[in-house]
Amino acid sequence: MNTIFTIILTITILVLSLILKDLLFEGRIKKINKLIPGPSTIPVFGNLLQINAKDFPKSVNDFYERYGKVFRLRLGSVEIVVLTGPEVIDECFNKKHREIFKERYIKFSRFFGKDYNIISSNGDYHYVLRGILTSEITTRKLNNGRLESNKFILEMFSNLCKDNKETLVKNTPNQIRILAVKLILNFTLGIEENDETILIIVEKIKCIFEAAGLLIYSDYLPFLFPLDIKSMSKNDIISSYFFLKDFIGIKLDAIKIKYEKENELKNETTDETSSKLNNIPIIENYYKNYLDGSIHYDSILFSISDIIFAAVDSTSNGFSLLIGQLINKPEIQDKIYEEIMRNDENNNTNNISFADHTKYPYIISVMNESYRYNSSVPITEPNKTTEDVEVNGYKIAKGTMIIKNLRGTHLSKEFWGEDALEFKPERFKNQPLYQKGLFHFGAGPRGCPGGRFTESLTFTFLVIMLKNFKIVNPTDIPIDVEGEVGLAMQCKPFDALFIKHTNRNDFSKINKGLNQQCFTSSSQFPTCYQTEFFEFGFNGNFQLNDGIDCSSGVQQLSFFEKGFVFRVDHFLFEF
């Protein structure tokens, strides 16, 4: 009884002390930032109790709609300024104030990786860790097959669909996660794991990202840490993290043994070895830098963990949300398919690489719109100011936590017009990747180092998938493409019907039946052949028109690499 009384008394005294400190003492940051608009605060908690713990990004975006592009929050003891909008974010992170905003604000929950991993390190050491990764995902290396993405993508569809014309894929997002894990493990660790291990890793990563996206109160009031620990333990987030860290540790031990037994990567100088050097897994590059004394041993484990967590979850959810959009808007699928067929001169699209992406402007516009509409991370890891700075007419104090509101930046009508909440690739027509106004990979020196990696995977995945399949909703209920809050937005489960496109070589049977034949009306065109033509991407765009004035002349239609002649007074098919 005395113990309980002592605990209650201690907590009461602590809270009263914090209240008095809050009311009577005004620190430098608070004094400067108080002129920035924002919601009123209460002692100790600030605005913490006004935040929806299960949807922090929505709460932040609601405040933006009330207080504007630059506003102030105080969560517990932490002074925060939230920035929204392409111009403001671009000015702060890419242009005028780039150097002032480049440091990471290390939240309480991130201290275990402080100065050891890519996400939570600062200064020169951060750029060493970051540079090891970015040196392996240059555009040249991606174009030259640094990723074996085609192999894994084709393997997934082969296993799922086999020889069936139509295949119902249950819980499609989970199948995409499995694909992402296989890709990323091969890229980072150079391994291909068994299906049982892959499924365990999928669940562990999903668990971490779902739970870590919720509000962690001790990030703002450290004395609440025991409550957060209890919550994290309940959600298995801690055990999941250490499972993956131990898994990576086992692979690292194997690399250590390999390097102790032989020094072939240093001694061999043949062209064959040079090729191997260009394709060794990321973890070996980190280990080589450890041997050189450039990084700590623990940085290998922490950095590889960062890469696997971030790449698997954000990439897989981005893929799944995009598939959902394409199912809801089949006309976009049709346009993509037509573009693929126009470029597929040698029926070789399954071997496509990111080097070909400039030939596919419509696919690039779809990718840009997907990055806008379905930002993987609606609020990125926070930065902090390294000196006082004025933004949009407001002075922000040195040491302030800075949050980028990407949900508002990408979806607000203020920046994108009345159709901001519509998935509309045409808004990026004939524009390259990395469009102004898009910050899906963050911004500035602390932007996501794996952006080009993700773009390469997304492009390859889209082309291979839609070259081979039309994806259909098996129900009348539209796919939910809003996602659920996590550290990255989580795509809700849905089923999808994958229908194989007819192989273009099957045109031989159409050729045999129709070559050099004329038809004066659509009624004379054999139904069996109509079906084949519709499967080749014409779905509603190709019609046999009766009763058209013969004086209209002749129109030429592009039909793959073959000539397709359309006459208004009759139909002549030339292959």
From Swiss-Prot:
Sequence positions that bind heme: 448
Keywords in alphabetical order: Heme, Iron, Membrane, Metal-binding, Monooxygenase, Oxidoreductase, Transmembrane, Transmembrane helix
A Pfam family annotated for this UniProt entry: p450
Cofactor list: heme
Primary enzyme class: oxidoreductase
UniProt topology in membrane: Single-pass membrane protein
CDD domains according to UniProt: CYP1_2-like
Domain of life: Eukaryota
Primary localization class, coarse: membrane
GO cellular component terms listed in the entry, alphabetical order: membrane
SUPFAM superfamilies for the chain: Cytochrome P450
Location in or out of the cell: Membrane
Annotated transmembrane regions: 4-24
Annotated GO MF terms: heme binding; iron ion binding; monooxygenase activity; oxidoreductase activity, acting on paired donors, with incorporation or reduction of molecular oxygen
EC number in record: 1.14.-.-
Family (UniProt): Belongs to the cytochrome P450 family.
Protein name: Probable cytochrome P450 514A1
Native species: Dictyostelium discoideum
Lineage of origin: Eukaryota, Amoebozoa, Evosea, Eumycetozoa, Dictyostelia
